[in-house]
């Protein structure tokens, strides 16, 4: 009996330590992430009260936001759970007429059905149900052998994965705050340029070192199969000025260069669709991942799709857009959105 009580006490102490540690990390995260936002808001007559986790208009004294989850950028717990659950959020979008890729969920219990019976349309996508930052997202899977190998690898890490139809086009991130579009950036697919001397592997390392020196994310998810399909291997030396794409995981955290898009050039039908998706999940702040051949063309004319919605939104991609030529663009728009 005494041993059982001792075990219970130890478990309680571990739980207390875990909760305390996470609270401290949340406050630290709030402090680090919102430094630039706080400075910009102060320029517009606002201040962030880090104790109350609110944004206050100084001359009015009005609390604009007061949320419990600072690391989720003003979003409540229920909305956070829906956004994190990619199958659920995409199902909500589909029911409400928002274009998303078709998907099914695969786990250890039903994987044989999808391997041996299901009619998979290639190329396809396999990714974690609740992944972030493009981690373990596998796009342009071209055949059954690739599919089986990738599926088995993913199911060693995750309880379930999503199988999606492959969507084509350029990759965009739409930052929405206060039910308004604050900024839009296009992620450029990572590539290398041959110089006639260095191998593919050397060129990739050189580019990653350059990205790291600029405090940007390197391309860690290298797709060697994709590179081989372009006629190259690790040790092969590309011709001078030859452009070789090195990954199909087009994500800022995987070395994709962000380029700002003029919001005024995006048609109203697209902007309304983005905001509708944001509101359906009841979010205050979100990052929509959208794919189309051209975001300035109405989505119903060029098969544009929302890939997913994120509620833990990284502002760094917006700061670094266009080689950091307008690092405060996003935060100035956020400040201007408070019409008091």
Predicted segments with their positions:
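ATP-binding N-terminal substructure of ATP-dependent carboxylate-amine bond-forming enzymes
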Residues: 2-84, 88-91
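Residues at alpha-helix termini
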Residues: 39-43, 94-95, 229, 276, ...
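General beta-strand structural signal in soluble alpha/beta enzymes
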Residues: 48-51, 126, 162-163, 288
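Residue-level "edge-of-site" marker
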Residues: 53-54, 106-107, 290-291
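A short beta-strand motif that forms the metal-chelation/ATP-contact edge
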Residues: 57, 61-66, 173-177, 181-183, ...
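Active-site nucleotide/adenylate-binding loops and adjacent lid/helix of ATP-dependent enzymes
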Residues: 62-220, 267-272
């Amino acid at each position: 009996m005494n041993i059982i009580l001792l075990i219970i006490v130890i478990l309680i102490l571990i739980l207390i330590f875990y909760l305390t540690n996470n609270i401290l990390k949340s406050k630290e995260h709030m402090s680090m992430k919102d430094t630039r936002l706080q400075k910009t808001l102060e320029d517009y007559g606002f201040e962030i009260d880090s104790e109350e986790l609110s944004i206050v208009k100084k001359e009015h004294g009005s609390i604009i936001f007061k949320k419990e989850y600072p690391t989720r950028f003003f979003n409540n717990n229920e909305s956070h759970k829906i956004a994190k659950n990619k199958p659920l959020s995409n199902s909500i979008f589909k029911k409400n007429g928002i274009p998303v890729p078709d998907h099914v969920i695969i786990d250890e219990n039903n994987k044989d059905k999808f391997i041996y019976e299901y009619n998979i349309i290639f190329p396809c996508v396999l990714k974690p149900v609740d992944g972030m930052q493009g981690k373990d997202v596998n796009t342009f899977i071209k055949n059954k052998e690739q599919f089986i190998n990738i599926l088995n690898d993913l199911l060693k890490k995750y309880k379930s994965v999503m199988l999606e139809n492959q969507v084509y086009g350029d990759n965009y991130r739409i930052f929405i705050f206060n039910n308004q579009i604050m900024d839009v950036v296009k992620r450029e697919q990572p590539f290398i340029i041959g110089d006639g001397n260095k191998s593919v592997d050397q060129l990739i390392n050189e580019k990653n070192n350059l990205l790291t020196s600029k405090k940007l994310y390197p391309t860690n998810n290298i797709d060697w199969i994709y590179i081989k399909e372009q006629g190259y291997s690790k040790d092969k030396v590309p011709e001078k000025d030859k452009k070789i794409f090195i990954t199909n995981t087009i994500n800022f955290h995987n070395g994709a260069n962000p380029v700002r898009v003029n919001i005024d050039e995006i048609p109203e039908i697209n902007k309304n669709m983005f905001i509708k998706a944001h509101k359906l999940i009841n979010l205050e702040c979100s990052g929509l991942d959208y794919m189309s051949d051209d975001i300035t063309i109405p989505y119903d004319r060029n098969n544009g799709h929302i890939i997913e919605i994120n509620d833990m939104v990284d502002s760094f991609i917006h700061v670094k857009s266009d080689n950091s030529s307008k690092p405060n663009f996003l935060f100035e728009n956020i400040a201007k959105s408070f019409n008091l």
